[in-house]
Structure formats: C-alpha cells, structure tokens
C-alpha cells in the first residue's frame, strides 16, 4: 500500500499525512489523477539480453523487448486540450516542450496518462547525444533542437486506470491511442537469439540498448 501510494501521490508529505491520519485505508485511497505526476518505475540492469529474458520469464514464456532510448523520461497527461508533461523527477516541463504538447494534444483520445521518452534526432533520424536532448528541454528560451516523443506504456486512457492491468493489456490500450510514429520499437519473443538480434539492431540505430 505504501509503495503504491508513493507512486501515485507524487508527494511524500501527502503520503505521510495519510498514513498518520488514516492508516492503510487512506493509503489505498490514492489513485491516478490527471495533471498529477506519477513516480516512474525504473528498470534494473542485466549483463546480457539472455539473462534479462530468463529473469523476466523463468518459464520461457514470451516477453516484450523494447528499445531503450537515451532521452529524457517523459510522462504526458492529456485532459481534453490541456496537456501537462513531467520528467522522471516529476518536474513540470510543459512550457518548455511545445512540440510535444502539440503531439500529445493531437492524440485521438479524450484523456490519457502516458509514459515514454523524448529525444532529439538528426536529419538522418539518428539520435543526438543525450546532452543535446537534455539542453533542448532545459529552458523556455531559444532551443537548438526540437524533441520527438516515443511512448512505451499507458497508465490511463479515457478515464480508465490501467495500472492494475498486465503489461500486455496496457500496451493494447497504448497502441489503440497512439500512432506508430510515437511508439517505442518493440519485439515480443521467447527466443534469446531473436531478442539479441533485435538488441543489436537497436544499438545500430544509435540507441542505448533494450529493456525487457
């Protein structure tokens, strides 16, 4: 209950007050709220793709292998035409990224909370260095590069919370809401060789690796 509340509240003092005054029922009452940043879940590392597959699915069942982009983690909240953008640390960067606000506003859903990354690409479609992406999101003034969003998870769509669904269910909702141009490249497989080949192709595109 504490971990869930910590993820959803976006505020440690709010969690502490709820725990002191209402105990577990008060913590359980925290839920997704449009416009309130959600603490992201962070991945752990593995030395090889094969080991990551085994860790994710010891029984050998298929798992999702996704491109890991070397950009800024970005959470997008859409409520009608109102869009807010939050970083990994829950800083509100809405005013700094008008091109991403426009992209999220264009989605054919009434409301959504999406998790993804944003990064800058060069003319050939390869990613710029992380520091270039970071500097392009750091201020409201003149920016050297525009950023492009890519999403890999949906936490809520059209008023429905998805956080208790398995990843496969959340991804189905994401695909229905987000056009392919804004989706992180992905492979579902139980084959270690296929996963390794996919990882090599992602690295060849200039990205950081894969997430399993």
Model-based region annotation:
Residues 1-150, 154-188:
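N-terminal nucleic-acid-engaging modules of covalent nucleotidyltransferase systems
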Residues 177-212:
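Metal-assisted phosphate- and nucleotidyl-transfer catalytic regions
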